[in-house]
Amino acid sequence: MVLDELISEFDRGLRSLTGISRMSRPVPAPADAPDAELTPAERTHAAGLMRVNHVGEVCAQALYQAQKLTARTASAKAMFEEAAREEEDHLAWTAHRLKELDSRPSLLNPLWYAGALAIGVAAGALGDKVSLGFMAETERQVESHLEGHMSELPATDTASRAIVDQMRIDEVKHGKAATDAGGIELPLPARMLMRAASKVMTSTAYYL
């Protein structure tokens, strides 16, 4: 681990928390009709869901930063770096959509980031196979979560739906890549604990 790498990751963390993340791909555009006018209730609900998704991407940045820094092999480091770059697109897309919905990111983002960073360090300390397994399970749970949001978002909110759908596609790819790279299946108690922690985060971030 070199100083340049630490500085680079520190910069990425600051960008994650300050809302100035760079996107390498444009914001996904709806394939069908543009947004119809959302009712105030629909707009509030969509904003809450997109705030949850934004928090998830803040956590993803912290997780993959920590896992990259603690990875043993160059191949694992490269995989975490690639996933982090695509997740940074997600971070920028969800921030963009929150602004369009006249809303804001979670007020607790520094807390979410710090917690995810600690979890990523712990996963990385257990070795690459466990760390990659943690990545695969994380992506599976995120995929399920995003599928739920697709059913909850207003049908007329085509902008949010386009973003969430592309995020889901990317998460599936990340999870498969982690499994193919040798990630092991986590034990049931670990998977259940991850779901419980995710439930606390999503329930809180919807409002705060």
Curated annotation (Swiss-Prot):
It catalyses: a 5-methoxy-2-methyl-3-(all-trans-polyprenyl)benzene-1,4-diol + AH2 + O2 = a 3-demethylubiquinol + A + H2O. It is found in: Cell membrane. Pathway: Cofactor biosynthesis; ubiquinone biosynthesis. InterPro entries: COQ7_proteobact (IPR047809), Ferritin-like (IPR012347), Ferritin-like_SF (IPR009078), Ubq_synth_Coq7 (IPR011566). One of its GO terms (biological process) is ubiquinone biosynthetic process. Gene3D superfamilies: 1.20.1260.10. It comes from the Bacteria. It holds the Pfam family COQ7. Its cofactor is Fe cation. Keywords: Cell membrane, Iron, Membrane, Metal-binding, Monooxygenase, Oxidoreductase, Ubiquinone biosynthesis. Its EC number is 1.14.99.60. Binds 2 iron ions per subunit. One of its GO terms (molecular function) is metal ion binding. NCBIfam families: DMQ_monoox_COQ7. Belongs to the COQ7 family. Catalyzes the hydroxylation of 2-nonaprenyl-3-methyl-6-methoxy-1,4-benzoquinol during ubiquinone biosynthesis. This is 3-demethoxyubiquinol 3-hydroxylase. It comes from Burkholderia cenocepacia (strain ATCC BAA-245 / DSM 16553 / LMG 16656 / NCTC 13227 / J2315 / CF5610) (Burkholderia cepacia (strain J2315)).
